[in-house]
């Protein structure tokens, strides 16, 4: 009886450790897999599985850098329910570390778009498997892509973001564009506004009449906020004017201007455009603001949310054709913004 019991115990695997069969995709054969935690919280609180004792500190640092790079990307680490709070970076790294050590092939397949060529050393222990070799080769191809290809991808993403912002309406509203480029706005639009248009642009605090229901047309708090924003805008305008004057002075030192040029400059200052010409000026101003965004010159905009976001790669056929025509026919600095439909 003791011999039978001993043989039975020898056949039973240890609890919390499963020996995967060769049919388990993404798992290494003969590799014990720790029992999975019940949920994401336990995974985040659990200590990541350590590498073998003979693994060097440099390799540990490389794996840690790779995990943090994937966690910092916009790739979803795990599925979450609606309304569930976002995972912290520590939680993401813990979940990624568990998947990396338990199922490195699954990790490589799922997060290969967030990997860089220097991260491939972290998957040397699975090389030789045709799936690992395929995904590693794909990561390597991405890293050795031609500069023109990378530049085109970046422009495609910014172009897709531009279309979204145009459709949203707020980012390229007169108010927002004037705040970002006050001097450019003044040159194309502001100096030609009528007194009525200037009055309509400046809200005033109008308390409700006695006995009349309702709230004031412009609450005092909003008026104070707009007054502060206007002062900040005027400071930007003054700074941009000083920068432009400095550039003009340098150009005047290099080129001599005759009286005829000065006379033509005075005539241009006295020119007052009609309604059709004002519309053309507005379109040109908007086009330059679009190009300014594409060139990465909007200092207050976080371009990493676009340049590093693969979601903006999903352009429809019409937008892709328009983008190719836009960038192939014109130089980046001089190209006007394309006319976009409002679909």
Swiss-Prot record:
Q: Give the modified residues of type Phosphothreonine.
A: 47
Alphabetical list of InterPro entries matching this protein: CCD97-like_C, Ccdc97-like
Q: What is this protein called?
A: Coiled-coil domain-containing protein 97
Give a Gene Ontology cellular component term annotated to this protein.
nucleus
Coiled coil feature spans? 224-262
- Taken from the UniProt record, the cysteine pairs bridged by disulfide bonds within this chain are none
Q: Which Pfam families match?
A: CCD97-like_C (PF09747)
Q: Which residues carry this modification: Phosphoserine?
A: 275, 337
- Which organism is this protein's natural source? Homo sapiens
């Amino acid at each position: 009886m003791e011999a039978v019991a001993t043989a039975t115990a020898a056949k039973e695997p240890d609890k919390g450790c499963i020996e995967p069969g060769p049919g388990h995709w993404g798992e290494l054969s003969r590799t014990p897999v720790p029992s999975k935690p019940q949920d994401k919280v336990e995974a985040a609180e659990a200590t990541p599985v350590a590498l073998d004792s003979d693994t060097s500190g440099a390799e540990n640092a490389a794996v840690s850098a790779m995990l943090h790079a994937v966690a910092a990307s916009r790739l979803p680490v795990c599925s979450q329910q609606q309304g569930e709070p976002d995972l912290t970076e520590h939680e993401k790294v813990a979940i990624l570390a568990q998947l990396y050590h338990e199922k490195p092939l699954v990790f490589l397949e799922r997060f290969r778009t967030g990997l860089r060529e220097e991260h491939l050393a972290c998957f040397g222990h699975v090389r030789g498997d045709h799936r690992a070799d395929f995904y590693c080769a794909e990561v390597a191809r991405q890293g050795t892509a031609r500069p023109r290809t990378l530049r085109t991808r970046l422009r495609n993403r910014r172009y897709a973001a531009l279309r979204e912002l145009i459709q949203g309406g707020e980012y390229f509203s007169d108010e927002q564009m004037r705040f970002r480029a006050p001097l450019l706005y003044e040159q194309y639009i502001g100096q030609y506004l009528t007194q009525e248009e200037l009055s309509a642009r400046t809200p005033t605090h109008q308390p409700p009449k006695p006995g009349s229901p309702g709230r004031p047309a412009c609450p005092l708090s909003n008026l104070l906020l707009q007054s502060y924003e206007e002062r900040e805008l005027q400071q930007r305008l003054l700074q941009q004017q000083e920068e432009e004057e400095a550039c003009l002075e340098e150009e005047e030192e290099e080129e001599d201007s005759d009286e005829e040029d000065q006379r033509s400059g005075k005539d241009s200052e006295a020119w007052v455009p009609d309604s059709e010409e004002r519309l053309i000026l507005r379109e040109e101003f908007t086009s330059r603001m679009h190009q300014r965004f594409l060139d990465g010159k909007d200092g207050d905009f976080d371009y990493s949310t676009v340049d590093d976001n693969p979601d903006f790669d999903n352009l429809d056929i019409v937008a892709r054709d328009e983008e190719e025509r836009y960038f192939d026919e014109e130089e980046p600095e001089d190209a006007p913004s394309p006319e976009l439909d409002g679909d």
